[in-house]
């Protein structure tokens, strides 16, 4: 069979977008005894992560710091720390709200004189302004074909698939039976 049932939603009709960043903080650091009181990149990074986690995300939105690293030894005030941060949503306004919160956190720490570099690692768009009537027509046709083939109703849901690009540009799209995870 070219089409198979998957354990997730069989038809993806809503695109979940994501933005991913590497954030690097650099400070003067120094020896933990002789330079005590110097700024610690890890402490600033921990504080920034705490600030990022203060937002109550909109419905259908998530965020995560998945990796953090930094420092060189137990007796060295960390000069550098990095984290990988992402947020995801199936709504454009929520993506912009999350971006504004991220930008505000970065700006706050830059104003403290901390050197911060932000590298965009990836950006996948979410659903844009899709004509609801045309999208529904496509879903109805696909659902009928699904019923004819499998003998049951299709399950519609959201996910990150090849449909992200057309859906983000307002083009009605579906991803059929090839999404798992």
Task: Give a label for each model feature.
Residues 23, 45, 142, 165-166:
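Structural element of the ATP-grasp superfamily
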Residues 110, 147, 167:
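Anion (oxyanion) recognition and catalysis
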Residues 106, 143-144, 163-164:
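Short glycine-/small-residue-rich flexible loop motifs, especially phosphate/cofactor-binding loops
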Residues 68, 152-181:
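Zn-dependent metallopeptidase/amidohydrolase metal-coordination segment
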Residues 57, 147-151:
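Residue-level recognition of short, structured coil/turn motifs
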Residues 1-128, 157:
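Midchain, well-structured core segments that form catalytic/ion-binding scaffolds
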Residues 96, 133, 153-154:
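Residue-level marker of alpha-helix boundaries and capping positions
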Residues 127-145:
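Short, low-order "capping/linker" segments at domain edges
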């Amino acid at each position: 069979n070219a089409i198979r049932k998957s354990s997730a939603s069989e038809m993806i009709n809503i695109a979940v977008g994501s933005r991913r960043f590497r954030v690097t903080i650099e400070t003067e650091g120094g020896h933990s005894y002789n330079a005590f009181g110097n700024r610690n990149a890890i402490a600033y990074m921990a504080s920034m992560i705490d600030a990022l986690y203060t937002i109550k995300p909109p419905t259908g939105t998530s965020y995560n710091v998945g990796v953090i690293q930094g420092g060189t030894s137990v007796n060295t005030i960390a000069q550098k720390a990095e984290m990988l941060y992402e947020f995801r949503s199936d709504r454009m306004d929520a993506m912009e709200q999350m971006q504004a919160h991220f930008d505000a956190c970065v700006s706050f720490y830059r104003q403290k004189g901390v050197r911060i570099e932000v590298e965009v690692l990836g950006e996948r768009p979410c659903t844009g302004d899709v004509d609801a009537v045309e999208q529904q027509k496509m879903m109805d046709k696909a659902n009928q074909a699904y019923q004819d083939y499998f003998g049951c109703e299709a399950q519609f849901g959201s996910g990150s698939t090849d449909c992200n690009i057309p859906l983000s540009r307002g083009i009605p799209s579906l991803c059929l039976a090839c999404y798992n995870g």
